[in-house]
Amino acid sequence: VYKRQGIGLKSRDKNIQIACTDSQGSSMYNYFTSGNLEKKGDPSFTEGIGQARITKNLEKCEVDMSYYVDDKECIEMLFKLIKTEGLFLGTSSGVNVMGAIKMAKELGPGNTIVTILCDDANKYYDKMFNKDFLNDNGLPLPDWL
């Protein structure tokens, strides 16, 4: 959950947990797991994600869990969501969905997980649906592309 939503929800129920999911090439995962601002992995093709600094909106955010999602996991999930659910989501949303899945696996049955689907695939069309780009970056090709 984004900081403001997470803080608002947590102020109403202290049992709510806030998770940060980060893409490869960013340092937020390391920051929230070890206090270190070191980048993990190669740069991601996800635009606008993968910062290496603590911004004002993160300064007082109490993150309970942090998850790391690489581009392969993200793109596989996005292609699955297109095929099975008809959801044409962008890579930031793919990172969020994968984080929600990892959180659900960690917490187990009986919990409610909320995430934000914050972008669509139009912004990433030239990469997500480009066979050469996917092959050159070792990313999976869906059978329908």
Label each region the model flagged.
Residues 6-13, 104:
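Surface-exposed amphipathic alpha-helices with a cationic face
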Residues 1-2:
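Short, small-residue-biased leader/transition segments that mark boundaries at the very start
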